[in-house]
């Protein structure tokens, strides 16, 4: 859940927002598996970046028309991950029998929404200046708006402790790869 600038590892207590409640219920539903002595892993995925669907795809259009910007204040944290790292991390967890319990699948370098917007603008050669007001997001998305207005500063601590290496640990390298925009 939203805890401002607090770094949230897998050991952090859950929040009380929509996404936190959903995660608690989802993970509780697997308690029987663990009680039976079967290894299980719960994946707490960050926003998986894709230029063709999901959050990134929706962000691209306003940036391409020079009207991109942060959601609300822009101070909320964004836990994100490149799809190649998401797949590699899942495979890593399958192949490492000592892995069990919850794992944050997100890049080790989270950004605020405003910082992510500036990086996206830089990669696209576009400004990041026009914020989307929080009230408009709440009106359009209802309770789900909390997922973009509150965010989490999540860190994949357990994954890092097991030795997983991210191919795209920072947003700029991830976005350049996904959008076909190599550094010039």
Range-by-range predicted roles:
Residues 31, 60-69, 75-111:
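Alpha-helical substrate-binding/gating segment
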Residues 146-184:
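C-terminal amphipathic/interface module of NAD(P)-dependent oxidoreductases
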Residues 14-19, 46-52, 73-83, 94:
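Glycine-rich "substrate-gating" loop/helix at the edge of Rossmann-like oxidoreductase active sites
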Residues 58-80, 122-151:
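Alpha-helical membrane-targeting segments
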Residues 86, 90, 105, 116, ...:
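Non-catalytic, hydrophobic alpha-helical segments
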Residues 96-143, 176-184:
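Mid/C-terminal beta-alpha module of Rossmann-like enzyme folds, strongest
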């Amino acid at each position: 859940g939203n805890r401002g600038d607090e770094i949230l590892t897998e050991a952090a207590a859950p929040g009380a927002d929509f996404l936190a409640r959903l995660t608690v219920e989802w993970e509780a539903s697997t308690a029987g598996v663990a009680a039976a002595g079967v290894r299980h892993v719960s994946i707490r995925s960050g926003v998986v970046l894709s230029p063709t669907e999901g959050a990134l795809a929706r962000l691209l259009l306003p940036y391409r028309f020079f009207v991109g910007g942060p959601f609300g204040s822009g101070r909320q944290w964004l836990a994100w991950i490149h799809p190649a790292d998401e797949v590699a991390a899942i495979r890593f967890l399958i192949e490492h029998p000592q892995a069990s319990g919850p794992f944050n699948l997100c890049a080790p370098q989270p950004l605020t929404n405003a910082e992510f917007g500036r990086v996206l603008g830089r990669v696209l050669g576009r400004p990041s200046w026009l914020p989307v007001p929080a009230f408009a997001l709440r009106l359009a998305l209802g309770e789900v708006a909390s997922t973009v207005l509150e965010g989490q500063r999540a860190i994949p601590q357990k994954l890092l402790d097991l030795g997983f290496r991210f191919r795209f640990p920072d947003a700029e390298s991830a976005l350049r790869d996904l959008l076909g925009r190599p550094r010039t």
